[in-house]
């Protein structure tokens, strides 16, 4: 499963086009939303209901109720769903394998046959802990940072686009 860094980058990339105001606060909010599904680690139910499309839709609905902003609701839904997608595409060696992606329709676990992201170790007592995790984070950053940068650049505010269009 990706690290919080990978999930933060994925959340920003997924939700950036939908937020009403694109600024640092919006990026921080999207990053935080994309990390929230892993709070289930605290109750030892990792990759369950919080790692599903249903949970992403609930998060978006709650956001809409609180903000009455369909754009924020969509951004939150996409940021949360990015977590599910990244975990689905990750190396997973601990049962149950995969994520409960389609809850509430089914409680089955799903795992991609293509593992894009290496597993992040939580076994800090092992000698390889730091090396393995630095390698995993490096892969995440190499894949997700360019995608995130491209999305942020593409969806930059209109005033910031002038210089790239030959305007003074």
Please place each PLM-identified region on the residue numbering.
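N-terminal membrane-targeting hydrophobic helices
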Residues: 1-168
């Amino acid at each position: 499963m990706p690290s919080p860094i990978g999930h933060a980058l994925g959340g920003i990339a997924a939700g950036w086009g939908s937020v009403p105001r694109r600024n640092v606060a919006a990026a921080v909010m999207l990053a935080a939303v994309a990390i929230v599904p892993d709070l289930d680690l605290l109750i030892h139910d990792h990759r369950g209901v919080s790692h599903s499309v249903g949970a992403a839709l609930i998060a978006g609905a709650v956001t809409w109720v609180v903000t009455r902003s369909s754009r924020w609701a969509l951004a939150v839904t996409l940021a949360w769903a990015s977590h599910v997608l990244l975990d689905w595409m990750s190396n997973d060696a601990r049962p149950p394998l995969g994520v409960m992606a389609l809850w509430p329709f089914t409680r089955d676990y799903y795992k991609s046959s293509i593992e894009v992201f290496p597993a992040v170790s939580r076994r800090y007592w092992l000698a390889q802990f730091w090396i393995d995790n630095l390698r995993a984070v490096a892969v995440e950053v190499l894949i997700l940072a360019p995608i995130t940068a491209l999305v942020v650049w593409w969806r930059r505010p209109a005033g910031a686009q002038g210089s790239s269009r030959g305007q003074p």
